[in-house]
């Protein structure tokens, strides 16, 4: 919510303190457009449409274009599921006004909803210095899709598989 302040702080302090990750990689990773870069570099991502701020498009048009049954809309710069909504081809009209308000203020993602989030949760692999250190599994509370603890989600230690670790290492290799 205080993105501009954070960017200013980073610019002012990047030569005064040492960040664990470089200023450039932090700045790149703040905006979820980094997913587009990873995809261009051969990393599989959730099917996503990237929508620039001010784009004139409706949710109906997006569902028609993608033929998805369910989707998630969210700002490209967001944390803790701020302005993140799970919508379907049957209820999208309920979200049209909020979508139009947000798209007029900031860039957004329209992503295919991955149902396994509800049953399996979301896995986060932590990489430090390009090396895997540990992983967590985030699960949504019953009746919600958001895995963040701000919304009742639960975080627990997770033992990543070798293929998951390899995927994370491949992602790190594809970062700028």
Question: What are these language model-derived features?
Answer:
Residues 6-11, 35, 60-63, 96-100, ...:
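Short amphipathic alpha-helical segments and helix-helix/interface helices
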Residues 24-26, 52-56, 76-80, 90-92, ...:
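Short acidic/polar capping segments at secondary-structure boundaries
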Residues 41-71:
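Rossmann-like NAD(P)H-binding beta-loop-alpha module
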């Amino acid at each position: 919510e205080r993105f501009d302040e954070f960017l200013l702080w980073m610019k002012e302090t990047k030569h005064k303190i040492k960040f664990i990750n470089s200023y450039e990689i932090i700045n790149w990773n703040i905006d979820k457009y980094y997913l587009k870069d990873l995809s261009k570099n051969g990393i599989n991502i959730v099917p996503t449409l990237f929508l620039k701020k001010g784009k004139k498009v409706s949710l109906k048009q997006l569902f028609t274009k993608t033929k998805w049954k369910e989707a998630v809309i969210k700002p490209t710069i967001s944390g803790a599921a701020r302005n993140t909504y799970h919508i379907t081809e049957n209820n999208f009209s309920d979200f049209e006004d909020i979508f139009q308000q947000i798209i007029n203020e900031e860039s957004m993602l329209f992503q295919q909803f991955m149902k396994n989030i509800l049953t399996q949760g979301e896995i986060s692999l932590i990489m430090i210095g390009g090396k895997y250190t540990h992983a967590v599994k985030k699960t949504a509370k019953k009746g919600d899709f958001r895995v963040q603890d701000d919304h009742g989600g639960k975080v627990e230690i997770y033992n990543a598989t070798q293929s998951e670790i390899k995927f994370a290492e491949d992602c790190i290799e594809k970062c700028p």
